[in-house]
A protein has these predicted regions:
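S-adenosylmethionine
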Residues: 1-424
Length: 424
């Protein structure tokens, strides 16, 4: 237990200081190395602590007159273990005290012990008080709660935020170039894997495993029979309206999930762009594993002079950089490290990408704008802005929605926005 708490508090401490969770775990020399049998438990503790950080932070403020930043992360993780995992309380408290010593904070071990024992005595009182605090009950910062409430209304906004507490499903996409969905389902059944089909149209290759497993245990994964991809992300290739023989651009391709799906849906000439060398490496690995071919290039898609040969594309996919507000259950750090002002900087990036790439689209061609955001500023407002700026653009309705298809998170999928723009 002490190793779990020590690693988890070190990672969480970096996140609370503003670093992303992925960078804190695997982001170079300053990241926390997770090794051995306790690594999975430490990761679970961090993810759980971030999902429930609103309540855990509320509890610590209730228990301490003045927070001590040196032990804040340790207390958050320890209270998470006490409240949400069923771990023996004495084991958690003792391990947290020993962890303080291991952190070279032996002078604070009595404080750690006192706060945790106080929580055990007052937990019911704290949970009752927390019911009156929206940040504690909904698990999101105040600005986020207000924005979603204004946008969706109170009931829908609460449904969206409470969905972030649910462990995300493991969704697969069948590679129909190698096997049919039914044959792959038979493969799952023969390997004693239970599965279900998501309740959403347009994702005909999607299968959700009832019990998540490591990638190495997914039947046929290494042979390229399937990919791991959220069901919502699988809609892009459907909405893009692909036809054989087309020239297609995936402008922000990494890690390659949508690129490879495009190649499974139609026989097209595909160019994959991404401005990150390491992320482009993942695109190439996925192409190879699945048995697909595409051109790849490391470049900033918005800078046409750096990569475009002047030949227009029939289809362009713009999976734009965004806040990631639709995928917080997979990346629970997002809601605590993002700031409301980040919406402006992402909005500028998105507008630059759209305006630049529109020039590379042929007349009669279609551009699909995608985000994994649920904020209007990155979605409907961007499309409205684009249509005003570009009179040769028109929106292609999908599911009867005039400005775009807004997919909010639920048990089957994350949150996404899709808008298909056609060049007159």
């Amino acid at each position: 237990m002490i190793d779990i708490l020590f690693s988890a508090q070190a990672i969480l401490g970096q996140v609370l200081s503003g670093r992303s969770l992925s960078a804190s775990i695997s982001g170079g020399a300053s990241s926390v190395r997770l090794e051995g049998r306790s690594s999975a438990a430490a990761k679970n503790a961090v993810y759980g602590s971030l999902r429930h950080f609103g309540f855990l932070d509320f509890a610590i403020k209730h228990l301490m007159r003045q927070e001590n930043p040196q032990i804040k992360a340790l207390l958050v993780v320890a209270i998470y273990e006490l409240e949400f995992t069923g771990a023996p309380s004495h084991a958690v408290v003792n391990a947290a005290v020993d962890c303080a010593v291991k952190m070279q904070l032996g002078g604070l071990k009595k404080l750690v012990n006192g706060v945790l024992r106080s929580y055990l005595r007052k937990s019911e009182e704290i949970k009752s008080s927390a019911q009156e605090n929206l940040v504690a009950t909904l698990g999101h910062p105040t600005w986020w709660i207000n924005k979603l409430t204004n946008q969706y209304g109170q009931k829908k906004a609460e449904e969206i935020m409470l969905a972030s507490f649910i462990h995300p499903p493991l969704a697969l996409r069948v590679n129909t170039r190698k096997i049919s969905p039914q044959d792959y389902k038979n493969t799952l059944a023969s390997s004693a894997r239970s599965w279900r089909v998501p309740g959403i149209s347009g994702a005909s290759e999607a299968i959700i495993l009832e019990k998540p497993v490591p990638v190495s245990e997914i039947p046929g994964f290494s042979q390229g029979l399937a990919s791991v991809q959220d069901v919502g992300a699988q809609l892009a290739a459907e909405i893009l309206d692909l036809q054989d023989g087309q020239r297609v651009l995936d402008a922000c391709a990494a890690p390659g999930g949508k690129s490879t799906h495009i190649l499974e849906r139609a026989s097209v000439s595909l160019l994959c762009l991404d401005q990150d060398h390491l992320r482009m490496k993942r695109v190439k690995e996925n192409l190879q594993r699945l048995g697909h071919r595409a051109k790849t290039r490391v470049a900033d898609a918005a800078n046409l002079d750096a990569w475009w040969d002047g030949k227009p594309f029939d289809r362009i996919l713009v999976d734009a950089p965004c806040t990631g507000s639709g995928v917080v259950r997979r990346n629970p750090d997002i809601k605590w490290i993002r700031r409301e002002e980040d919406l402006h900087s992402f909005s500028e990036q998105q507008q630059k990408l759209l305006s630049s790439l529109w020039k590379a689209l042929t007349k009669g061609g279609k551009l699909l704008y995608v985000t994994c955001s649920i904020f209007q500023e990155e979605n409907e407002h961007q499309v409205e802005w684009f249509l005003k700026k570009h009179p040769d653009a028109e929106i292609a309705a999908y599911h009867g929605e005039d400005i775009g298809h807004n997919l909010t998170p639920n048990k089957d999928h994350d949150g996404f926005f899709h808008a298909l723009l056609e060049k007159k």
